[in-house]
């Protein structure tokens, strides 16, 4: 009986720790994307010609939402992922220290 309780407690702790890591990573990533939106306006890099402008246009409308609640803003996170895939070299250049 004690082993079952210990096992369940261990599983809960592991789940909480992994969940917090995901939230932290996501928060950092959203912060990075918001920064890229501001800093990336004049950076062409390896982006497609329209990639940066599209993201910045989205960010201008959603910037407050991204910064305020990136954990639950699925649309912002999705756009961040698209931006990350399209403009990885620019993102890494702008956001290496964040």
Swiss-Prot record:
User: What does the record say about tissue specificity?
Assistant: Expressed by the venom duct.
Which stretches are tagged as propeptide in the UniProt entry?
22-28
The positions making up the signal sequence are 1-21
Q: Which GO terms describe its cellular component?
A: extracellular region
Query: Main localisation, per the record?
Result: secreted
GO function terms (MF aspect): toxin activity
Family statement drawn from the similarity comment of this UniProt entry: Belongs to the teretoxin C (TC) superfamily.
Question: What does its UniProt record remark on the domains?
Answer: The cysteine framework is C-CC-CC-C-C-C-C-C-C-C.
Name of the protein: Tan_12Cys
For this protein's source organism, the top of the classification is: Eukaryota, Metazoa, Spiralia, Lophotrochozoa, Mollusca
